[in-house]
């Protein structure tokens, strides 16, 4: 055959394309057959000529060259293809599509060798202009001469008008052959070349690639796509391809020859959609004619189009449709399969006849036919008998035939929608409206010509004519982790994807599967779901049928509606009907080749899902045996993607929608040859494309392996609504404006429309269904009422079959029950009438049946004296949902074998679940309770009080809350609050508790089993487990019993007793067994767990300290022993109780669903959360698309959150179209974001496509108009006033209780301002209203109005305390509305907010925020506590950020975290989440931190008003305004000042504890890692404050620091006039300020109080009799100033040589460099004492030279006094300094006499009593010669401090000072009989002589000996004194005179002079005496000391030679 020269038809016809309509007005242009060869751009375009030939025109020789496939790629510069068609019937021939008007048609008839009236042709040329691919598309209408072209070698006369020329780029995909009415395409002949079979097969796979023909509905003629974004039925035949760059390139659509002008498509999509909307549900059967009125298929042109077409006033154009069917023979082919190993030969498929069903749309104007066009063509392509020959390990797309495009033309049932969705971001549209393929799109590669070059990996991208990627309805393909779809890999486009006779199936717009532009159908595919079920396989079989074995069944029926996708949509079989080849082979192929998720639906597949249920597996299977699970049948509705999506393969790895036949997995290379392609999880794209192509060719190969037998119908699983995992059903009715729940019915109501059903689920939110009918039925001799609820598309699975609507039964309520009860209301009524009767439960009862008033205390008011038994006929029953105690009182009653489930009881007085009180030998046995009790007084899990009554073999499990602040006595217990009386017994029972309490006084008790056990009551053989968090430390709290003491009698004999009990309870502020210890307690065999955390804040030695409590621990067992001990004590097993009649727990079982894969069970569960309301078949369908590499396959999905970028979306209705991201939150805190794109609505659910996954997502809410609800409730809510009585009543407070400490007033106002938006979110997040109904809406209105105060309080509370972010994601809405975030999908945000608001004043107090989360929110969120929840959020949104870093970035507080300079410490401090971390968040969330409630206030600070300083041992908090004044005004000045000083303060605190770390041993060092609270005073200045602010602010103060932090934290600091004070676990600055320098010294003082006993003193504690102040001031505290003349250690301040005070400095310059270890400290003090002892010796000698009177003036005597302490001990010395008598003076003859007579200087030690625990310092230059000791106890404060330092100099800190000032030798003292009574206990008494003995090992017998030895040691070195130069104090200071000496004698002379002067002046006794000025001795000693201090570099060396 010769190539016809330049066959380029250039006839043009301007017309507006509407859906399925060829404009009647076409300007007829007749052109002669003058076709000059088109010019080729510099981009090497090639001329491709399509000549249309009837098979009758072929010679037998030519028929042998026929290739039964579709041309694929441009190979040469100039190519001619003869496209061969077979005539279906003469009738069909008679009318070819007419594009002209009636008059024009008459004119056109002339000269047509074929009676064709106006043939519509697309001429397409592609060119690249300014980097944009532009397709010039012209509709050429013409006939006759203009088209008659003589063919030299092969004549084509009959179809000459269809000839078309294209200018394409080499390697580009070829356009698809056109659909010609009355003809069936069977193959092609390429001029001058014979195509090998292998090529043919390859081409099949790529068939879809040619221009995508518009596929008209393949399934149902009458159905029209009405989705605005999807293009509607496109006139298939004409569109050759044009506007889509991709269409020519990657037309993976089955045969869509479509390609319509983008602009026209747009018009079609808009106009036609409106016109066709009415006909959406109409279904035309074959040959059925519909009148224009019946099918409101009215198409109109835009005025401008009408002008173009020559017609301005266009009459109404109507149409009807008819169906025609033609059979197609099959042939035999041999294919090379790259998927098969070389040498392997197999029969790929047996031949099978195909058939072609065409739906012709006949257009008429004024009842006269003006034209007709093929709306859709459903081709079951013949399956050629294909023999495969393996060439390598690649899959030959020959199998694609199976998936091959059935038909390039529109398949029947597919609605071709010309308009491409413009919003698709994937494609750029050029100025011509043609899509510009973006090179970045992975799906399509654009050649230099701008044409998409098919890439093996991007089969998915199909660009619509508009240049926008067509959306594929969520093609089954899954690209969660999909590899990029490769266009060439088109898995054979599943031929079967569209049902062959899809015409019957109305295709539904893309409701079901929103296409993700990037997904497989990427560009151009639009997936639409058919609303009707896909027809049987035979009809639906399309290329996709064969796709994967399982795929066809589900996918079939879906057709590509996109013009460009015209390639057969999945679901159609393009194979000729005649193919007799057996389908068995195709089945195999399909099975063998998993579909690549990315393929299949590649371009143009439009997945249309039928809404009917999938047929049973056996029915759905095609010849291939297995039907592609879900994809088959899905067809792309997009113009460019008409190709059928490949059916999903069931193979797990191919999550793709389209299943590829064996070869389908291969990608098609540019030349059309298949290349092996790894199974990408989703091969939908390729499959659909290629399979479509093959099918479209009609080649036998085209059949997909899964293709069903032509005679069988494979139905896509019908997508319906299904309510799964139903746990309970509640029936409500509206009567007289009141809603009532019905547990049963008495009769059939006359007005069922006033009823609705609340369907509760164990996994999903409540759904409200309107009741359609209620009828009475008799079953098993019982009268039941059948309740039927109806909602669009809702079905219910009953006995493995689905039935429309939702039904359930309620029992008939017995008019009266006397003994056996099945109704709670009847039970309550009966007992109230006769409280002494015997009652049995005959069913589990629901307490919701009875509503109580707000003031009612119990359900049964009178005292019950009868019997209540919860067991009947061997079944155990329960009462559910008690809101109040069941009984008020029990007296002599019996209650047994009863369970109380889900109690939620609250009350202001004493409460218990079963009863408030039981007395008079009431017996409670085998009663089990679970739930929550909250109150303000006594609480018991079963009883608040049990007097002379017993509880046996019973249990409680749940939460008990009473954090109410009151001084009233109360008792709280896990089982019973107060157990009292000698007959009272609790035995063989257990409690699992979480108790939150706030005991304030000793008569408030809390116990894991009982609070108070007194008057001989007993607890035996029982145990408690769980947690007790008691905020305050003054109550009696313990794991078993709070108190056993009988307060009534005060007699230990009548106390309560414990026998064989165990505590496995973590207790804060309490003990393990009992909360109060006394002698002779009646306890026996008590046990506790070592693993429990039992911390007690208590009063120890005059101080409040927090430490682990080992008191009342009983026998401590290892954690491993606890379980066995519990079993031994009490092997209690709880009974199994019957659920409520309306309850049930049935998880979704997917195993019975067709195509279920066991290994995907988790995946189905995950998809279930993405499609919460869809039926199981649909879930399985999409579950099979999930890639095995995807998190959706591997991890449990907890929740899905819609977002717009980084903003959480809750209001779905308002943001339906703007949502663009879906956050998937998986278990283990994993998450991922997928692109989200709205597709359409289905049954009031918004459907979205998910990224490139091919998956669907629907929010967990139905779309309904919330406006009416909001309008009704908003006014009422707006009227609520924060200070109203209604609010107070809701809070439960009296008028005189302030609401201040809620700190909600400002937020309350803000919340009201934003109420409308909040209500939209709330209604969206809450129960699903499946149908707009005044009854269900009224129920919500009523609930909101009735609880408006509580709702506002709850909403305000959460908006106030949870308004913070993680990065860019604010979590407020997650906390408020997305309660399912952590996997608990059935919580109601509305109910949660209301219950939170009703939880009471105490629960809503800001300071209780941590407990409030645990009490009111944790269970609703499915979490455990606040901090684990915050961490989970952080791990999801900021996985690479630590908790602390996130916290610091979010809070507006100024945080300084100062790590140690010691490397090992610094390293530990960087360990996040450990006790070593100095991260503020880590520390304040620690379990041992008292103020964990700081987290939320700090996270929500609105401004910078608070600073935080964190160092090794402390955590400080202060307000900026504490430093605000006229000098530091608000703003930058204040901020800079505070922040600079905060940094400096942090460094000082760091240095102080670095010092201590260096000198302590390892054990003590470990204890330095702690968390002492530092608080600056609540004193706030303003810009006018002078100096320091002094006024104390209270919690009402408006200061921002108080309002937003200090107040909400609730630490009511007691302010006083001190500089600061410590409590043992905290330091409070009062007069001093934390950031000042004196605040640093205060820090060392107060921290000594918090550190001495357990850390500084080695854990030995303070020595008995020494008060806390002894250890701070004058001993371990740093000196106040550098020039302090005291014996102290500077451990905190760094001084500088350049300081102004340097000349006077007497303390260590820099402690960080001076003290590197304990030896350095000892060396410093020892060397310092070298100077001290020497100077004291010199002074003493000088004084001895004076007369008696002078000596008396200069010296005093220190003595001891003894005063009894509170325990009567008279052993603690009090130092008294007094003047000497003459006699005493006269005894002072030698230096040692000064020591022996306890002499000290009068210069700085005034006469008087130095009280114990005083603030005294030891003077550096005022000698204490005395060695006064206390041999019967503890030294006085003066002598104690001095001797302590002397021991430090002599023996060091650990070996000298610590033994002296601690109780280190207490045990030795006790052994020696030295004891005292302390706090009722006998303790060892350490005496001075014992210390002397132990420290010096009997070296000295008296302290005088020790002291003399110390002086002597220095005297012995006087001759080696180092030379020193010092200020000459005898000269005026202005002279700066110096004196140098190395002679002690010279120093002695100087001292003599100085002493004499002082004696002469006699200043020592003056009141205003100042030694620095008035004492010559002081000045001399100071000068010498300072000189030696400097000379020795802070005493790093001695003042004596050769001594260090």
From Swiss-Prot:
Residues 419-469 are annotated as: 3 X 17 AA approximate tandem repeats. Its main location: secreted. The Gram-positive cell-wall anchor motif LPXTG is located in the N-terminal part, in contrast to such motifs in other known streptococcal and staphylococcal proteins. The protease could be cleaved by the sortase and anchored in the membrane via the two potential N-terminal transmembrane domains, whereas the propeptide located prior to the LPXTG motif would remain attached to the cell wall peptidoglycan by an amide bond. The keyword Plastid does not apply. A motif (LPXTG sorting signal) lies at residues 96-100. It is an enzyme of class 3 (hydrolase). Residues 1-42 form the signal peptide. Its EC number is 3.4.24.13. This is Immunoglobulin A1 protease. The lineage of its organism: Bacteria, Bacillati, Bacillota, Bacilli, Lactobacillales. One of its GO terms (cellular component) is extracellular region. It comes from the Bacteria.
